[in-house]
Design a protein with these regions (language model features):
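P-loop NTPase nucleotide-binding core
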Residues: 39-175, 195, 347
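Short, amphipathic alpha-helical interaction segments positioned at domain boundaries
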Residues: 303, 371, 378-396
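Short amphipathic alpha-helical interaction segments
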Residues: 341-360
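Sensor-1/coupling segment of RecA-like P-loop NTPase cores
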Residues: 153-162, 168-174, 178-213
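Winged-helix-like regulatory helical subdomains adjacent to P-loop NTPase cores
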Residues: 262-346
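A short, basic N-terminal segment
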Residues: 1-43, 63-66, 188, 380, ...
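Conserved small helical "lid"/interfacial subdomain of P-loop NTPases
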Residues: 225-252, 258-259, 270
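A short helix-turn-beta junction within AAA+ P-loop NTPase domains corresponding to the substrate/partner-engaging
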Residues: 210-227
């Protein structure tokens, strides 16, 4: 009986299954080592949804903490909208990750009596200073971090702070202006500042930061994550199935690789669905095709807005969407799609475009020109392509 899946959809990949990204890891470590020389380093890790940003950050944190003796912490900022909450979560994460270390007593005074145990049996902790003290931390953030680096000198080489899921509060100018002021203060007042910040966000978040504070982007070393190549995808699937003593037929492996399209989000969703569908120790193409349909349904339910999900799956427009979904493409020209439609589908195509626009699934692509549309969320064409691919294979 199967006890666990080696695949982790929606979560960072386990370190033992991490593949590819060698050049990016080398680049990140180069900046990390520069921070140990007393220089503030700022990296913006950019990539589309499901491309593996958090996995790469988690790998970096593990090696810098365990192998390079950094004080490292990974701060998840979903739902954060204020600078007070941002700074509170940073210090709370430092406390949670390191309060059981011997050296932590050197900085424990900074947390005072503002740490509370919560939950059953006090298994979780929160850092909750009064709002006025949080405001002071926001205003004196560089000094607070510098004091920590001074206290742990000799025990830790530098601070490594990952700010993950920054999409929410970057829509306002507050963060961009505050972070620019933070970096400027360090440049002028701190000769030594061994701190390495990694911000993680979508490409459009970089654009938003630039609009709010045009000079901010020159501060960051931008690292962009691209899709994995086929060899890396194959390596990942082999590692994952080997870990649970399962084999995979060559044609099944080829199909999984093709439909994963180099995207970790698809690799994990397809892999997990295939794993649970298989009843024998060898994965066949039959398992894979069943897994693709399951994975498409999972992605639709997990990542798409319910109204969008229902609209995309409606029989009225499904045939059109399947023709759009013959390839993963973020944009399309309406005449290219019209040429693929039969007479009945062509009659409703205008209504289709109007309805998809009303739901916020597509918008007119002004930059491309007249007749061009693009998907608002890059997961939409992924889902449509995957569902379309599964439908075709089911018909065979």
């Amino acid at each position: 009986m199967k006890e666990y899946s080696p695949f982790t959809p929606g979560n960072p990949v386990p370190l033992e299954f991490f593949v590819g990204r060698e050049k990016l890891v080398t680049e990140i470590f180069r900046y990390a080592h520069q921070s140990t020389r007393g220089r503030l380093e700022n990296v913006f890790l950019s990539g589309d949804r499901g491309i593996g940003k958090s996995s790469l950050a988690s790998l970096s944190r593990f090696f810098l903490q365990e192998k390079e003796n950094f004080l490292a912490t990974h701060v998840f900022l979903g739902g954060t909208e204020t600078l007070n909450e941002l700074v509170r979560r940073i210090f709370e994460a430092i406390y949670k990750d390191h309060n059981n270390k011997n050296w932590f007593k050197k900085i424990s005074d900074y947390f005072g009596n503002h740490v509370n145990k919560v939950g059953f049996f006090g298994i979780d902790v929160t850092f909750n200073p009064p709002e006025e003290k949080l405001a002071q931390l926001v205003n004196h953030f560089p000094q607070a971090l510098y004091n920590i680096t001074e206290k742990i000198k000799g025990d830790k080489k530098a601070l490594f702070i990952i700010l993950d899921d920054i999409n929410g509060f970057c829509k306002k100018p507050d963060f961009a202006n505050w972070y620019k002021s933070f970096v400027d203060y360090v440049a002028v007042h701190q000769l030594e500042f061994p701190v390495f910040f990694m911000l993680i966000g979508l490409p459009e978040i970089r654009d938003a930061l630039s609009e709010h504070q045009p000079s901010l982007l020159r501060i960051f070393r931008v690292i962009e994550i691209e899709k994995l190549n086929n060899d890396e995808v194959i390596q990942f699937f082999n590692k994952a199935f080997d870990s649970v003593q399962m084999k995979i037929d060559s044609d099944a492996l080829q199909t999984m690789t093709e439909y994963s399209n180099g995207l970790p989000i698809l690799m994990h969703e397809i892999g997990d669905a295939v794993f649970w569908d298989a009843t024998a120790n060898t994965i066949t193409n039959k398992n894979v095709l069943a897994g693709i349909l399951q994975a498409a349904d999972r992605i639709g339910k997990k990542y798409l807005d319910p109204k969008v999900y229902r609209a995309i799956r409606s029989e009225r427009y499904r045939a059109i969407l399947r023709k759009i979904g013959e390839a993963i493409q973020p944009e399309f020209h309406k005449h290219d799609i019209l040429d693929k439609l039969n007479e009945t589908e062509q009659k409703v195509f205008g209504n289709f475009l109007k309805r998809m626009t009303e739901l916020g699934i597509i918008i007119k692509d002004i930059e491309k020109g007249r007749g061009y549309y693009k998907f608002v969320n890059k997961l939409y064409p992924i889902y449509i392509w995957l569902e379309s691919a599964g439908f075709k294979d089911k018909k065979k």
